[in-house]
Amino acid sequence: MMSLRIYYGGTFDPVHLGHLAIARAARDELQVAVRMLPAADPPHRAVPGATADQRFTMLSLAIGDEPGLLLDHRELDRAIRFPGRPSYTVDTLRELRGELGPSRPLAWLVGADSLLGLTRWHEWEALFGLAHFVVAERPGSPLQASVDGELGRALEGRWADNEQALFASPAGRILRLHHPLREESASAVRAQIAAGGPWRALLPPAVADYVAAHGLYRSPTP
């Protein structure tokens, strides 16, 4: 049985305690390292509030030297090599699949909201041939019951009962984490900062210090 490689992509704008909780849950349940991969400029989201370099720095501060959490900057590097090209997950997974070979198990870690919006992703149906999905559900909202329509048909037969299914094949299965999503969201954190509300407790201390020192996410002064 080949070892599993897990990547957790996102804008991390800013990285908050909910992001880290998801990464740690996947690391602990699957007993493999999680590689956190900041996106350049995702085509299906608004332009991030911090620069790519700032988001990378914040993620590096959040991870520190914590065992089992690693940082991968390939999407940011690709944006430098090909300025103006959209950052698509399918391109990243194809690059990873080329590096790892066709047989190595590969998984993409997401929150439930991302999976439910999968049909808006570029070449979304191709993703299942490239990687597994590991999904953090929201408390009190069973993911499988929320999926219907085109996505529901695409996910039929892919749900894994346990983590061994991810190690047994290279791609195509969906595993739900036992640890549910926390309530934090990056958009809520940005809104709290802009409004002058309490926000520090939502971020790792080193990230909170960085945000404050650089004046990130504050409302423009009239």
From Swiss-Prot:
It is an enzyme of class 2 (transferase). One of its GO terms (biological process) is NAD biosynthetic process. It catalyses: nicotinate beta-D-ribonucleotide + ATP + H(+) = deamido-NAD(+) + diphosphate. Pathway: Cofactor biosynthesis; NAD(+) biosynthesis; deamido-NAD(+) from nicotinate D-ribonucleotide: step 1/1. Keywords: ATP-binding, NAD, Nucleotide-binding, Nucleotidyltransferase, Pyridine nucleotide biosynthesis, Transferase. Catalyzes the reversible adenylation of nicotinate mononucleotide (NaMN) to nicotinic acid adenine dinucleotide (NaAD). Belongs to the NadD family. This is Probable nicotinate-nucleotide adenylyltransferase. It comes from Stenotrophomonas maltophilia (strain K279a). The lineage of its organism: Bacteria, Pseudomonadati, Pseudomonadota, Gammaproteobacteria, Lysobacterales. The gene is nadD.
